[in-house]
Amino acid sequence: MVHHSGSIQSFKQQKGMNISKSEITTEASLKPSRRSLPCLAQSYAHSKSLSQSASLFQSTESESQAPTSVTFLSADKPEHVTSEESRKDSTLKCSFADLSDFCLALGKDKDYLDESEHANYDRSRLLNDFVTKDKPASKTKLSKNDMSYIASSGLLFKDGKKRIDYILVYRKTNIQYDKRNTFEKNLRAEGLMLEKEPAIANPDIMFIKIHIPWDTLCKYAERLNIRVPFRKKCYYTDQKNKSKSRVQNYFKRIKKWMSQNPMVLDKSAFPELEESDCYTGPFSRARIHHFIINNKDTFFSNATRSRIVYHMLERTKYENGISKVGIRKLITNGSYIAAFPPHEGAYKSSLPIKTHGPQNNRHLLYERWARWGMWYKHQPLDLIRMYFGEKIGLYFAWLGWYTGMLIPAAVVGLCVFFYGLVTMNESQVSQEICKATEVFMCPLCDKNCSLQRLNDSCIYAKVTYLFDNGGTVFFAIFMAIWATVFLEFWKRRRSILTYTWDLIEWEEEEETLRPQFEAKYYRMEVINPITGKPEPHQPSSDKVTRLLVSVSGIFFMISLVITAVFAVVVYRLVVMEQFASFKWNFVKQHWQFATSGAAVCINFIIIMLLNLAYEKIAYLLTNLEYPRTESEWENSFALKMFLFQFVNLNSSIFYIAFFLGRFVGHPGKYNKLFERWRLEECHPSGCLIDLCLQMGVIMFLKQIWNNFMELGYPLIQNWWSRHKIKRGIQDASIPQWENDWNLQPMNIHGLMDEYLEMVLQFGFTTIFVAAFPLAPLLALLNNIIEIRLDAYKFVTQWRRPLPARATDIGIWLGILEGIGILAVITNAFVIAITSDYIPRFVYEYKYGPCANHVKQNENCLKGYVNNSLSFFDLSELGMGKSGYCRYRDYRGPPWSSKPYEFTLQYWHILAARLAFIIVFEHLVFGIKSFIAYLIPDIPKGLRERIRREKYLVQEMMYEAELEHLQQQRRKSGQPIHHEWP
């Protein structure tokens, strides 16, 4: 409701509010328009915060214009104050908060740099003297958290007031003094306040504490279009929503009878975030009085303040020259050794959180999220977002969603595995292999290999059946549908989060050019069609040339990976005969398993070694392209890293799945590599066991290695840093910024490694799931640990990363969708080619006892093993033996008219395989497309709410502008109009 009578001053006097000096001055005139900036309105509904925010900003401006007003702090009345102002000022009710805000003008025009600059006066004594002399009738008490925050020694400047927003670190012995000096002078010229302080543990280390004052904060918040709250949200319900609410209330009553879900967090333990329940709009200094500013020190969150400071650091020059700009270049050339925002305090407390509450948000995150004892609890996403920023918040939201969706996939995969385990002894194929004591298999190598009884493969046949049974096709279809459902519902979840976190249309508002791009192409400018302003432009010819060079580098690295896989294949061929003649009987009997196991370990070592080179090459190629924005740089770098890692990780698996044992020839005419090494054959029970072994070992070892590098390595480094400090000083005397410096920095590429690890795992879980149904279960167990491991790492082991914003998970969503498509194709080929599902199917309905419905009471796969093995005359091998040996293939026997040629059954199986691939792909793709069509990316209710709020925001803008003009007319004595001018 809008009030059209009285003024702000009279309204505040009626409510008993304080009136600041700045409210007595005449407000700057505005020229409102219906086409002015949206969302910049505030009515009498928040008149208290309105007048307070106006006074905060205007007092800063007035004090900067008249420095002599600082003498108002003395007991005597200043001479330049008029009698009318003196009369009004004498009625003010002074409070500690008002005085603290006013005292910010002290030293505003002063450059804060030297260590001793803030030691010239005792601020607390000054405040106490003033409060004692004036003896205000009432005081605004600070909250417990505010008092602990002000008293903390590691979060403020030496004056005990100015908050530390960013930390720069350098060494005194570094020779880049001129660059640092120029850079720091330019920072002060931009409005930042700096304060130096040496490290306690190492005097050679110097810290520069950076504080961004209110006026500079407002200027850059307006420039960056930072959205801030300006009015509480008002919700509406139509008849349809009312009916829904009745149903929801009914279910709520039922839930009350049931026990509380142990996975749900206790909401009373978390602070309410005011901005999540307010309409927001881009900040504007001209209309600062419209916003809800209860406290200007907390109006912009810590994350926003740090983000604005980093924006300034990245665009400040340190030398003459267009490219000599940015803190990252200064860190690269050694001028500074680190730059980071500080943590909000210690993450542990001697006082229990249940009785004394959290000391700070970091402490709260540790107790309610990062501790291992909270592994079964939901994540406090709003608090994560508030502390680490939206980008990291979205990562943990996606990781939690992915982990939750793995539960049904793991359950179904486990059921398929248990089905194979229960029916393993009933398998007709396994029974025939285990009973084939008189069937001899042809030697699998030319030297040191002898004839082998078929029943020696009994164990391998049973293990193969665990992963290759009747549920394999069903599980492959299920996982393809699961991948689609997971991605579609994540899009809905993401849209809800972007709305809740006020990220709708954020990218168009805040995306800026990279300094490197601006420095490279500053001479070639074009008019931006959106902003209408000139900006640097990269010519198309230059862009295409750089992309061609980058693509060439990518193909070179992929060819290097393929070469490494080929080397492992050669190794398998060389050591195959060596293991067959090994001295140890166990290795000699299981030489194929030993060959595969050793090859897997060597392949894993090669994967880890190549990973070290991939990151540097991808970084070099991405910088060579000169991406326009940070998001483009991240997407390009992430795509290269994914391609390198995906090929590196899966190339050996693709070889085993689709090439191992496919082109070996037949006894007497084997194909050889370089006319020397005979190609490797599959085990008598099939190649699927080799594929399972390869996937299981790589997945298990890689997850252990990643977890160690993510947590174990930082733990060791941080322990060593603390150990060196404890030699000469106590931990209690170390300030927060030095404790943060002793932590490990976050990876320079941000969340890329975290996403890459999970996306590669998603590929393992979906692409070859037909061969390894336990992959979702292993992924689920790993992710339960991964969430708390990452949380513990972010909260306790890493310096606080820059709180960046993002609307989605970036290019990773497109990569996940591509993996989902590739998974359908790959599983179709795995079922059709790698497994024996199609040969069994053809035998069952064409060549077996049940063909043409002749014998319906017998097992339809009876005789399948004998049918799938071909004959070869041993006399042709020159081994001095007679008789026949068997081998896996569909070729004619030696006594046929066309010996060792493919039989008709081979061509039937080949046709069935191709037909299955086509039918499977079309069926699954059709189901995936239908499901994607049924599930909209944005829920209908959310879409309606967004449209409703846009309408309300525009109406509020008109209403508040009218109200502000009426206030102006009341002050000037002009007539009031109750309609829009």
Swiss-Prot record:
GO terms for molecular function: phospholipid scramblase activity; protein dimerization activity. It comes from Mus musculus (Mouse). Its main location: membrane. InterPro entries: Anoct_dimer, Anoctamin, Anoctamin_TM. The lineage of its organism: Eukaryota, Metazoa, Chordata, Craniata, Vertebrata. Has calcium-dependent phospholipid scramblase activity; scrambles phosphatidylcholine and galactosylceramide. Does not exhibit calcium-activated chloride channel (CaCC) activity. Seems to act as potassium channel regulator and may inhibit pain signaling; can facilitate KCNT1/Slack channel activity by promoting its full single-channel conductance at very low sodium concentrations and by increasing its sodium sensitivity. GO terms for biological process: calcium activated galactosylceramide scrambling; calcium activated phosphatidylcholine scrambling; detection of mechanical stimulus; detection of temperature stimulus; establishment of localization in cell. This is Anoctamin-3. One of its GO terms (cellular component) is plasma membrane. It is a multi-pass membrane protein.
